[in-house]
Design a protein with these regions (language model features):
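Cytosolic regulatory regions of ion transport systems
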Residues: 1-34, 39-42, 46-48, 61-63, ...
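The feature identifies polytopic integral membrane transport proteins across all domains of life
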Residues: 50-57
Length: 350
């Protein structure tokens, strides 16, 4: 082990050093030259000088600050130390700063092009890029809800996007470029530590996008079943396959689109109502509030909701949803009350 370390040191440091190591060595040599040279020539003129003073003079000269608290008084100190430190030191320092700036630019470019690996926790991962507007709306709606929070990190995975758009950069979205069905790509997005995953259709309106979403769902569920996955699909026939793949929730946009069209025809204005209820940006929203405590009739639960500024619409249970149930319908602990209100309630009890 020691022999291997020595060989690595000889190869990487002595025989084939990187540019950064070369610059660091040259800077250290210049600091040593300036410090020792300043003391060697100036100590006779000023016996109170110390090594710290010599180092300070060298640093001040190399950075062109020039405080003037220390300066060479002898001709040898000026021409053999001062001039070399000024010319060569400034050049070396400028080159070192340019290397640092180039490294920062390269790092930022890699991040925007999706070449980075992220170490995150309790974040959201969005799969596929159907367009800036869709991604923006999903993130903004989620961040407006206290359950999600404004500070939660978001990672976007897509294999075709060349660079993260400026609009998503403003939302502090991280980008991972790669095949979303591959383990290597999922690892780079820290999928094992994520709490939520939203799988969007890559080409809205194209049922063929469902095949990719099924593969992504299988890849996620094969790694971590604790991730809460919501999948968009185009073809209603795909829903059963997605359930078998293990996703938690499915949104069939083609089916909802047909429903919205027919309802708008039968009940003009329903679109405005749903837009208000489904958006966190304005008005009232739907909420699923956990019920806590002893079983109670729906009438008592509705009264408790009204007392907190909410309207009770129904109950979500393991066997389905009950909308506008009978007044004596029993609501048990663990079930969720469907309400409409101005903000999310943590729990509901009677």
């Amino acid at each position: 082990m020691i022999i291997q370390l020595i060989r690595y040191f000889k190869h990487a440091i002595i025989f084939n050093p990187s540019s950064a190591i070369r610059v660091a060595v040259l800077l250290a040599a210049m600091l040593a030259y300036g410090t020792t040279g300043f003391l060697y020539f100036e100590l006779s003129e000023n016996p109170d000088l110390s090594w710290t003073d010599g180092l300070w003079y060298t640093l001040v000269t190399m950075t062109t600050v020039g405080y003037g608290d220390f300066f060479p008084k002898t001709s040898a100190g000026r021409f053999l130390v001062g001039w070399p430190v000024m010319f060569f030191g400034i050049g070396l320092l400028g080159y070192a700063l340019s290397m640092i700036a180039a490294a920062l630019v390269t790092e930022k470019s890699k991040e925007l092009k999706g070449m980075m690996t992220f170490s995150l926790k309790d974040h959201l991962v969005i799969f596929n890029f159907p367009g800036v507007t869709m991604i923006e709306r999903v993130i903004e709606e989620l961040r407006l809800d206290s359950c999600f929070g404004r500070e939660r990190q978001v990672v976007l995975i897509d294999d075709d996007l060349a660079e993260l758009p400026a609009e998503l950069q403003k939302l502090h979205v991280h980008f991972v470029k790669g095949n979303p069905t591959r383990d290597e790509t999922l690892k780079r997005a820290s999928i094992d530590e994520a709490t939520h995953a939203v799988i969007l259709s890559k080409k809205p309106g194209d049922p063929a996008s469902d095949n990719l979403n099924i593969s992504i769902t299988l890849a996620i569920e094969g790694r971590s079943r604790k991730v809460n996955t919501v999948v968009e699909c185009m073809d209603p026939a795909t829903e059963e396959l997605l359930r078998k793949a293990g996703c938690d929730r499915i949104v069939c946009t083609s089916r909802f689109g047909a429903n919205f069209m027919s309802q708008e025809l039968l009940n003009p204005g329903v679109q405005e109502v749903l837009d208000d209820l489904l958006s966190s940006r304005k008005g009232q929203q739907f909420y699923f509030v956990p019920f806590q405590g002893s079983p109670a009739p729906f009438s008592a639960v509705a009264d408790a909701c009204r007392g907190r500024g909410h309207l009770a619409l129904g109950v979500s249970r393991a066997d389905g949803v009950r909308i506008n149930p009978q007044q004596d319908f029993q609501v048990s602990e663990g079930e969720r009350v469907i309400t409409v209100g101005p903000s999310r309630l943590a729990v509901l009890s009677v």
